Amino acid sequence: MAKRDYYEVLGVSKTASDDEIKKAYRKLAMKYHPDRNPDNAEAEEKFKEASEAYEILSDSEKRSMYDRMGHNAFEGGFGGAGGGFGGFSAEDIFSQFGDIFGGAFGGGGRQQRQRRGSDLRYVMELTLEEAVKGVKKTITFTAPAPCDVCDGKGSKNPKDVETCKTCHGSGQVRMQQGFFSVQQTCGTCRGQGKIIKNPCHACHGSGVADRQQTLEVTIPAGVDNGDRVRLSGKGEAIRDGQAGDLYVEVVVREHEIFQRDGADLYMDVPVSIADAALGKEIEIPTLEGRVSLKIPEGTQTGKLFRLRGKGVRPVRSSMVGDLLCRIVVETPVNLTSRQRELLKELQASFDGEDSASSPKKKSFFDRLFD
């Protein structure tokens, strides 16, 4: 009987992520595990089929080979790879020689790697002030954690946990591929080396259960959009393995006044026509409080003033950026009768003489009509 497509076996698409593949396999394994289906040959066959599919699709190199050549990649030795070792790294090749020749090539004595849970991601939204100055925040999220009932063991009674008879507790089995002996994860115990005879009723033997968790997170001063804070061991928990990490990713809300570019801050400073023309000392806000800014006589829209050291000190940097103030000269609106009169008088005074009061305007028209 022809083998079914591995993606079809797990019920996932060919573009499925590693997490999606893991979740699909876990669901099938719990459903068809021999311990939960004694004397059920069909369930045992489905369990083996799912384990075989997961063994290939959970390994990036094997998955790549399978995507290119299908089941032929793992049948009849290394057929389909042009007679060589297509798709296998040098480490894989020498590890297989080591299996045969007693570790002469450094691969025979490798020990099983400790299983590890998946890393998790939490998006935290901050104000600009919080990102620049640092903050402590409490977060709440739901993630797999050690089961409270069985203390993460998968069974309340330690006597109900036995050494796997297929792999004898190693979590690995040897598969013959032509001339070579290849070590693979044991499909019976899923690489754990143990079989649970009487699974915990709360977690069904997995040793973990989804639980709401609350953590206090310290965000360092100077973080920016996309920066991540790593909380070691706070990710997905798994039975008989190491928990993954939790990554808190920073998203900074848009500020009504300041825009950030690396270590520097930018802001628009509105100035009246009179203040821009005559000059004035004004007060402007910064993240540290209000400071004075001197507007020289004749300041134009777009003029930048730099206030050194009023920006941001990025994470892992000893340098503080600057605050750059862009002047925006505002045209007055909703004029009173008196203001309109005065502006008309001013307008007439400008139009009535060849004044140097508008040098850019004069230069523009000179070029236009030359």
From Swiss-Prot:
UniProt GO cellular component terms: cytoplasm
Ligand binding (Zn(2+) 1): 147, 150, 200, 203
Domain (J): residue spans on this chain: 5-70
Protein name (database record): Chaperone protein DnaJ
Gene name in the database record: dnaJ
SMART domains named in the record: DnaJ
Domain remarks: The J domain is necessary and sufficient to stimulate DnaK ATPase activity. Zinc center 1 plays an important role in the autonomous, DnaK-independent chaperone activity of DnaJ. Zinc center 2 is essential for interaction with DnaK and for DnaJ activity.
Main localization category: cytoplasm
Places the protein is found: Cytoplasm
Cofactor mode of binding and number, as noted: Binds 2 Zn(2+) ions per monomer.
Binding, Zn(2+) 2: 164, 167, 186, 189
Pfam families: DnaJ, DnaJ_C, DnaJ_CXXCXGXG
Keyword Zinc-finger belongs to the record: yes
One GO molecular-function entry: zinc ion binding
Cofactor(s) required for function per UniProt: Zn(2+)
Quaternary structure (record): Homodimer.
Role summary: Participates actively in the response to hyperosmotic and heat shock by preventing the aggregation of stress-denatured proteins and by disaggregating proteins, also in an autonomous, DnaK-independent fashion. Unfolded proteins bind initially to DnaJ; upon interaction with the DnaJ-bound protein, DnaK hydrolyzes its bound ATP, resulting in the formation of a stable complex. GrpE releases ADP from DnaK; ATP binding to DnaK triggers the release of the substrate protein, thus completing the reaction cycle.
Matches recorded under PROSITE patterns: DNAJ_1, DNAJ_2, ZF_CR
Protein family membership: Belongs to the DnaJ family.
